[in-house]
Amino acid sequence: MASAAEQLAANLNFSSFAKAKELQKRLLFTFGALIIYRLGTYIPLPGIDTAVIADVFEQQSGGILGMFNMFAGGALGRMTIFALNIMPYITAAIIIQLGTAVLPSLAQLKKEGEAGRKKINQYTRYGTVFLAAVQAYGIAAGLEGYQSATGAAVLDPGMFFRMTTVVMLTGGTIFLMWLGEQITARGVGNGISLIIFSGIVAELPRALVNTLELGRTGVLSGGILVVLIVMALGVIAFIVFIERSQRRIVVQYPKRQVGRRMFGGESSHLPLKLNTAGVIPPIFASSILLLPITAISMNAGQGPGWLTDVAGFLGRGQPAYMLLYAAAIIFFTFFYTSVVFNPADTADNLKKNGGFVPGIRPGKNTAAYLDYVLTRLTFVGALYLTAVSLLPELLISQYAVPFYFGGTSLLIVVTVTMDTVGQIQSHLLAHQYEGLIKKSKLRGARR
């Protein structure tokens, strides 16, 4: 016999979506917010020559700048008010999360529930403003050194231009931070992830057209194009398979008698995903590495010689960059998994509800067992995230494809799509349950 939830899920169709007015409002709000974000990626900073910027980024589309531009939805290549995108906010969130594991004061705030969470969010916003201002000043200073055959990138360089750029870029990041929070609260899906997702999706058509053009002109052979297409499809299928994989730990509940009736005695399971951390580790790793490397790359031409050497040493496809990126992904996979799943708390909740894992004593033994299983799953998940993020990158650098179309972007697109679709299905299921409850109440009233 199918469960009630399975029967409801089987009945989900367009008619059920048409009746879910709340879901429709949330989707419209989400689409509207993302449209506003996309419009902002076309508003240029004051005082720059966009033609010069376009020439510079056209020459460096296959490097770190092209990779960051992909995450920014093309805003960096057009040098718009959203050029920094949401990356300073992500970096600040990483620093605060690491602080909760190191600093006792932040750790105490984390334990204080809703009030502590609000305080941590406030610190994250302060950190976002500081990081965005520092990075914006670095970009402004770097822009003043950009030259092309048509002239300089900055029309009137100086302190006024730098301060104006800092205000505009910092304000753009703050607005995106607020917009992401609004999408999460009033829309569908995680707002920050959807902003990054929409930026990548907006740049993919241009990347595909450029690839086909390279094939048409003979820069890339037909065989290489086929390899790239097959690789992309294979990576997508692999991501979907792994993201749906989970280890189910059997949980049993003892029988208990209430009056003359027996309750409990049933078996359930505790699902542990193979990749508990989701898409967060690659996003965190990209945020930590891309912003400083991009700043170094933008200032390398006008700085000391060692800065140029560092920019080349940390360039995309270089062993040092690959090693740092892989180490960051593995670290954030274990770190974020420990944030979202606490074996001790889970074991304590099972014990309070009378549940136990067969063959494992409740309490500390169950917590140790869950931690053991989770560590092994996280190790495999970290290898999976590293492979998906780096193996396509190695192939692309080998074939010299001049733009970023690697595994990280595919991972973000596929994972965010799956999470958002799952949330839509959850809203539809909740709407169907509400309909069933209303019908049962009406029948009871008639009787």
Task: Annotate each language-model stretch with its function.
Residues A2-K110, A115-R447:
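N-terminal cationic and glycine-rich segments that engage phosphates or anionic surfaces
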